[in-house]
Regions:
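Sec-dependent N-terminal signal peptides of Gram-positive bacterial secreted proteins and lipoproteins
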Residues: 11-17
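Cross-family detector of peptidyl-prolyl cis-trans isomerase
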Residues: 2-8, 19-355
């Protein structure tokens, strides 16, 4: 039988060989994520965090203004950064993920110098939406905001598809490497540094000065106005403008006399935003909709624009209505229904009966 001394010595020596003084040091993963950039041209951001590196491809061709803001802050070339890397040392102040102990995977958010979701660089800038850039998968880099055209320094990276955010948050990049880092970070994790890498002749010419940013803001504002004008033209195409400001178009003729005031009516309806997003409907327009809507015209039950239009309809008529905010839900909107403040809203309405 071996002595106790020999057994202890054997265990100790074996332990040292297996994982102690004589063990080879573990290889560091730091910098390994950079391998994904080999042979690639473009502008990339490398966020070094407590949990590892996140490598991002920045969409500098598709969203040049938003990328200029991000790069200018990261490199300290925008006035708000005061010559210092703005993001270095900031926290991911908001994390919603299973790794963080939440019930679902969503995203990580950072870029707030206050660290509580209320801070920014001291300015706000407009949205820069691009058709086809959507939250169809995880790993999308996008601007956080508190509503339309309120971008600053805060950004987020998604963990899963989040398509309900499409065209509400500007997407300006995506994860190339380190999605596992994104998925595993916990709230309060630090961005040790954010480094910008330019590869290729075109990317190397990309500058992010205050003058560049100011110029791009004007260009994007003009492009946004032109795009919105085209969208609006499509919304009211073929419509007549009522003296009240409501646009309408008769889609199907009715019979008899117009409904008028004080009538008990029943209507099928579909309510939607000018981008086509439906917020409410009855079964006549949607298989999962409600029962037809019953109300008394001019009885103060409905929004003014809707009531006014129904009064002018004939039984059997289907009419499209585009109602201005002052005759709909005003400056407040109905956020819980997805209706923003100050929004024009549309209805397709069929008058089923009027008594």
């Amino acid at each position: 039988m071996k002595s106790i001394k020999k057994i202890i010595f054997g265990l100790t020596f074996g332990s040292l060989i297996a994982g102690g003084l004589f063990a080879a040091p573990k290889a560091s993963n730091k910098g390994k994520s950079m391998d994904v950039l080999n042979g690639k041209e473009g502008i990339f951001a490398v966020i070094d965090t407590d949990g590892g590196e996140i490598v991002l491809n920045l969409f500098y061709k598709e969203t040049p203004m938003t990328v200029t803001n991000f790069v200018g802050l990261a490199e300290g070339t925008l006035d708000a950064a005061k010559g210092k890397p703005f993001y270095d040392g900031l926290k991911f102040h908001r994390v919603i993920s299973k790794a963080n102990g939440d019930g679902q995977d969503f995203m990580i958010q950072g870029g707030d110098p206050k660290g509580n979701g209320t801070g920014g660089p001291g300015y706000k800038f407009i949205d820069e939406f691009v058709d086809g850039l959507t939250f169809d998968k995880g790993g999308k880099l996008a601007m956080a905001n508190s509503g339309a055209n309120t971008n600053g320094s805060q950004f987020f990276i998604t963990i899963v598809p989040t398509e309900w955010l499409n065209y509400k948050h500007t997407i300006f990049g995506e994860v190339l490497a380190g999605q596992d880092v994104v998925d595993s970070l916990k709230q309060g994790a630090t961005m040790k540094s954010v480094k910008i890498i330019r590869q290729g002749d075109e990317a190397k010419k990309f500058s992010a000065t205050q003058a560049d940013f100011d110029k791009l803001q004007k260009e994007v504002a003009k492009a946004n106005e032109e795009r919105e004008a085209k969208k609006w033209a499509a919304v009211i195409d073929g419509c007549t403008k009522h003296s009240s400001g409501v646009y309408y178009k008769v889609l199907e003729e009715g019979k008899g006399s117009v409904c008028g005031k004080g009538k008990n009516v029943s209507v099928d309806y579909k309510g939607y935003l000018t981008d086509g997003q439906i917020f409410d409907a009855s079964r006549g327009f949607h298989p999962q909709g409600h029962e037809p809507l019953d109300f008394k015209t001019n009885g103060g039950q409905m929004i003014p624009g809707f009531d006014m239009m129904v009064q002018e309809m004939k039984v059997g008529e289907t009419r499209k209505m585009v109602i201005p905010p002052e005759l709909a839900y005003g400056s407040r909107g109905i956020p819980q229904a997805g209706i923003p403040g100050g929004a024009y809203i549309c209805f397709d309405v069929k008058l089923l009966s009027a008594k």
